[in-house]
Every structure is written in C-alpha cells, then in structure tokens.
C-alpha cells in the first residue's frame, strides 16, 4: 500500500512539474499568448499602412492630380503660369 501511495505522489509531482515548469507550461502558454496579441496588433497597423500605400500607388497610376500634388509638396514645383510667393517671418519669431 505504501508503494502505491508513493507511486501516486511521484506521478502527481511529475504532472505538476510538467504543468508549471516544463515545456508547454502555463507560464509559457501565457507568454506565447501575449506575443501573439502583440504580433496581431502590429499586423493590423501594417495592414492599414499597406492599404494607404496601395491607395496612393493606385492614385499615382491613374490620375495626374496626385502626381501634381506630390510634386508641389515634396519638390516645391509650381506651374508655368503661377507665381510663387514665400513669406518669411522676422528672425526669432515663431510661426
């Protein structure tokens, strides 16, 4: 009878070790879930960014308005019939 009880105790301790410390333990599963949630959030942000970039590429391929806007904003270009005015503030003055 003692050896049966001892065997059951050893078996219980072995299972508890596996549950709390071993591979696939509660702590490891919790950490993997946290990592998975962080990755899902990052993927969602990247999906939004990719959708915006895809829309911009489509707009650049199909219309001249997007190209003109980008040339004005990033390259400072103007049309031939336009006059460019640059307003400069006084030194030390913040806009």
From Swiss-Prot:
One of its GO terms (biological process) is FtsZ-dependent cytokinesis. The chain crosses the membrane at residues 4-21. Residues 26-73 form a coiled coil. Residues 22-95 are periplasmic. InterPro entries: Cell_div_FtsB, FtsL/DivIC. It is a single-pass type II membrane protein. The keyword tRNA-binding does not apply. Residues 1-3 are cytoplasmic. The keyword Coiled coil applies. GO terms for cellular component: cell division site; cell septum; plasma membrane. Keywords: Cell cycle, Cell division, Cell inner membrane, Cell membrane, Coiled coil, Membrane, Transmembrane, Transmembrane helix. It is found in: Cell inner membrane. Pfam families: DivIC. Part of a complex composed of FtsB, FtsL and FtsQ. Essential cell division protein. May link together the upstream cell division proteins, which are predominantly cytoplasmic, with the downstream cell division proteins, which are predominantly periplasmic. Belongs to the FtsB family. This is Cell division protein FtsB. It comes from Thioalkalivibrio sulfidiphilus (strain HL-EbGR7). The lineage of its organism: Bacteria, Pseudomonadati, Pseudomonadota, Gammaproteobacteria, Chromatiales.
């Amino acid at each position: 009878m003692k050896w049966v009880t001892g065997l059951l105790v050893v078996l219980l301790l072995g299972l508890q070790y596996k549950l709390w410390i071993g591979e696939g333990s509660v702590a490891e599963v919790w950490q993997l879930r946290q990592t998975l949630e962080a990755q899902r959030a990052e993927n969602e942000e990247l999906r939004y960014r990719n959708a915006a970039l895809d829309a911009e590429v489509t707009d650049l391929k199909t219309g001249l308005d997007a190209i003109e806007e980008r040339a004005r904003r990033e390259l400072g270009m103007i049309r031939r019939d336009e006059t460019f005015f640059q307003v400069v503030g006084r030194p030390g003055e913040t806009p």
